[in-house]
Amino acid sequence: MAIKIAQTNVDEVYSKIVEPNLYTNTWLIPGVTCTDKYTEKAGGVYVHKIVSGGKKAPTAPGQDFTNEDAADTLIPILYNNAYNYSTKIYNAQAAAVGYDAAEAHLRDNVEKTRESAQASALACLYTEGTALAETTKATADNAKELLINARKEISKKKGTANVVLCSPDFYATVLMAAGKEFTPETNERIVTTGQVGRWLGMTFFEVNDFSNGDAVYRDSSGTAKTVSSANLALVDFVMYDARVLSYIQLLNMMRLKDSELFNGVLAQTELVAGFKVTTAECAAVKKHTA
């Protein structure tokens, strides 16, 4: 339908600028929230873990050694999570629009691949981490106590924690809780940026994967494990040591490929990765009752 101003038909144009889509926050960052130190060129990686007998009571001096047999266990991390996207763009389509269609679709596929891998990492933490017995609903008044208690539970098992992944609801609660405490530099940053950053000795991330549908990953046995959106919605936070979430990549490809079957290009991405919580005692999952 033509647009008129008074009695004159006026021109209509399509913008050359593409409105960006919305994607989940980036939080899966090697060296910050996970580790990729076990990456190898293979179909899977098996990590040795020494069986430790623990501490001993002292004896009187002048005793013979008591030998223990060396033993270890294996932690499997398999490259069995593959994500691939392919979008067909006809040259006739690309020539008829003012924006770079191939680049735009490739960028979209890159973001969707990232989102998919992050959802899998979250499912891995949920499934292989340790659920806390505490199920109290978080509020601004008790958020700090819940966090300290979770850290305490990890510490009792000889572990440490330096990362907290928060649901959007809990992150908002933390903003209110942290804002109540007068720490000038920290308080000012929270007010101006809306980001907690570091608090209580840990780095906080708002993770909207908690509220964006089911999360699926394939575990080290090759079994697809699904965490439903309903179960994710009950999670307040996951607290863990970044060194115990392994995220290894065998292949991470993106390309624009000319096709021999049609006049155009394919915008393609593929990621092959593996996920593992190598020490469950250092990953605490805080849920609340429905």
Question: Each predicted region: which residue ranges?
Answer:
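Generic, well-ordered alpha-helical segments
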Residues: T39, A57, D69-A71, Y79-N81, ...
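Extended, compositionally biased alpha-helical segments that mediate assembly or anchoring
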Residues: R243-A290
